[in-house]
């Protein structure tokens, strides 16, 4: 039995789920907003907020952790330059999830997740 499961499964094996969340996190940091399903957006929120919090710390260890997660090295350097200035007054809540219309093919709940 899986009591108090904390990780959303998203209908995928663990390796595929981690790769998908890494890709979505990279895209969110690069573009500033991503349109995806509501469940994926909620799972992405945790990862993106963790990366921004690490970028606010600015230490070498946190930079290496983000480099190991985000796919684009130049994007990590840009994140570490702008995140402390952009989010200095916030202690969390760096993203916003807005619900949109359902997807036409399978009627899945869609959402836009964007950086505040």
Curated annotation (Swiss-Prot):
One of its GO terms (biological process) is translation. It comes from Synechococcus sp. (strain WH7803). It holds the Pfam family Ribosomal_L17. InterPro entries: Ribosomal_bL17, Ribosomal_bL17_sf. The keyword Cytoplasm does not apply. It comes from the Bacteria. This is Large ribosomal subunit protein bL17. GO terms for cellular component: cytosolic large ribosomal subunit.
